[in-house]
Amino acid sequence: MNIILLGPPGAGKGTQAKILQDRYGVAQIATGDMLRAEVKAGTELGRAAKAVMESGALVSDEIIIGMLRNRLSQPDCRNGFILDGFPRTVPQAEALDTMLAEQKFDLDAVILLKVDEAVLVERISGRFTCAHCGAGYHDKFHPTGVPGVCDKCGSHDFVRRPDDKAEVVKDRLVAYNAQTAPILPYYEQKGRLHVVDGMAAMDQVTAEIEGALRRAGVAAPATA
């Protein structure tokens, strides 16, 4: 099972990738996490990425693809992988296809989580976390049991990410649509794109993803 999960910020890609990882024993690969791990480990690619980031520039596709190549060689990818939110552009998609072919990986399916933009703004702008233990909450969908008190540790201190503000979220969605929209026909022409309603309940979204994978002929890996 080698798949890509696409969708705008707040569509639930990370949540669904984690569910599929736990259920089928495949590796969830989020490029941001991978990049931070490489930088922290001080690998050759990590050092190159750190130098680029410290200069204020964007890490090149070549570096990201190189990191992905290394990541896919690790044992937890033996049953397959889920790429969470990558690629974002057609050049990235083309470079990814080339690298996967070189490494003898077949890309089975690309799942697009489609969510209404007004819902996305509400989902993202309502998020907050406990400043003490990091537990995540939402004003509407997952409030604390007792207002102002963390369910897990009892702290009264909470934080919100600056880029979760409604106006910032709207700007991120504009950027996503401008940058990522062209890769949808790229994968559709290859017969790999499958659209799933990301506005349903979490379990229903998972079921729809699994249904799309079955229709695509993707066999679930055997789990120990």
Curated annotation (Swiss-Prot):
One of its GO terms (molecular function) is zinc ion binding. It is found in: Cytoplasm. Residues 126-164 are annotated as: LID. Monomer. It comes from Acidiphilium cryptum (strain JF-5). Zn(2+) binds at C130, C133, C150, C153. It comes from the Bacteria. InterPro entries: Adenyl_kin_sub, Adenylat/UMP-CMP_kin, Adenylat_kinase_CS, Adenylate_kinase_lid-dom, ADK_active_lid_dom_sf, P-loop_NTPase. Residues 30-59 are annotated as: NMP. GO terms for cellular component: cytoplasm. Pfam families: ADK, ADK_lid. Its EC number is 2.7.4.3. Keywords: ATP-binding, Cytoplasm, Kinase, Metal-binding, Nucleotide biosynthesis, Nucleotide-binding, Transferase, Zinc. This is Adenylate kinase. PANTHER family: NUCLEOTIDE KINASE. Belongs to the adenylate kinase family. Catalyzes the reversible transfer of the terminal phosphate group between ATP and AMP. Plays an important role in cellular energy homeostasis and in adenine nucleotide metabolism. Consists of three domains, a large central CORE domain and two small peripheral domains, NMPbind and LID, which undergo movements during catalysis. The LID domain closes over the site of phosphoryl transfer upon ATP binding. Assembling and dissambling the active center during each catalytic cycle provides an effective means to prevent ATP hydrolysis. Some bacteria have evolved a zinc-coordinating structure that stabilizes the LID domain. The gene is adk.
